[in-house]
Design a protein with these regions (language model features):
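Short, intrinsically disordered, charge-balanced linker/junction segments flanking boundaries
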Residues: 1, 191-198
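Internal alpha-solenoid helical repeat scaffolds
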Residues: 2-172
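Cytosolic nucleotide-utilizing catalytic cores of signal-transduction proteins
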Residues: 139, 179, 184-188
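Alpha-helix N-cap and coil->helix boundary residues
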Residues: 149, 189-192
């Protein structure tokens, strides 16, 4: 059954076995092409979950991920993906910019793409990345030297993070606060924030 193959493909990508994951995806497409017995709702559900998987497989290339996430949202509508999706997509990173900035001169565009991508992706995983787009914007401001504006964006993100208990993104926000404090030579703030992280 096509439902059984999707979790396996997801695990292949999660463990870094991309070639094997792609082979499983080819098999899924073959199975879906031969299954004329599936009703339209089930087919949309399966294909929506598959598009989410393809998005996951293209991790950190936002220009490729974005079309997949739009297709996922359209196919799933307000339903959850067919398989559990525990990942926030942060992969234990302390910086969203570190994860998604790929090319010199593209920072502004990458931030814009992430601002479009993140609300869609977050809504598909139960809102577990709400506020991450604000952190990405704050990091962009930080690396361009706009420390005060970056700090304001971090506080906006923290309002969302605390409201929704988004602890996956909280650490990214605090680490950015530490970097801002370090740039200002504010050791008291750094000690306080490190105490929060502990």
């Amino acid at each position: 059954h096509p439902k059984a193959i999707l979790p396996f493909a997801r695990q292949m990508f999660a463990f870094g076995h991309h070639e094997m994951g792609k082979e499983v995806c080819v098999e899924f497409e073959r199975i879906m092409g031969s299954r004329q017995d599936l009703d339209e709702e089930t087919r949309s559900w399966l294909m929506g979950t598959y598009e989410l998987l393809l998005c996951y497989a293209e991790y950190n290339d936002l220009s490729v991920m974005l079309p997949h996430i739009h297709k996922t949202k359209k196919l799933l509508e307000n339903r959850k993906a067919l398989i559990p999706w525990p990942d926030t997509g942060l992969n234990d990173s302390l910086s969203l910019l570190y994860m998604y900035h790929r090319k010199a001169g593209e920072l502004e565009n990458e931030t814009r793409l992430f601002s479009e991508y993140n609300p869609l992706y977050s809504s598909l995983i139960g809102g577990r990345l709400d506020g991450a787009d604000l952190i990405m914007q704050a990091e962009r401001l930080y690396v361009t030297g706009a420390f005060q504006e970056a700090e304001i964006e971090v506080y906006k993100a923290l309002l969302v993070i605390h409201r929704d208990k988004q602890w996956h993104t909280w650490l990214c926000a605090v680490m950015l606060q530490i970097r801002i404090a370090l740039a200002r030579g504010n050791w008291h703030t750094i000690e306080h924030l490190l105490g929060e992280v502990e």
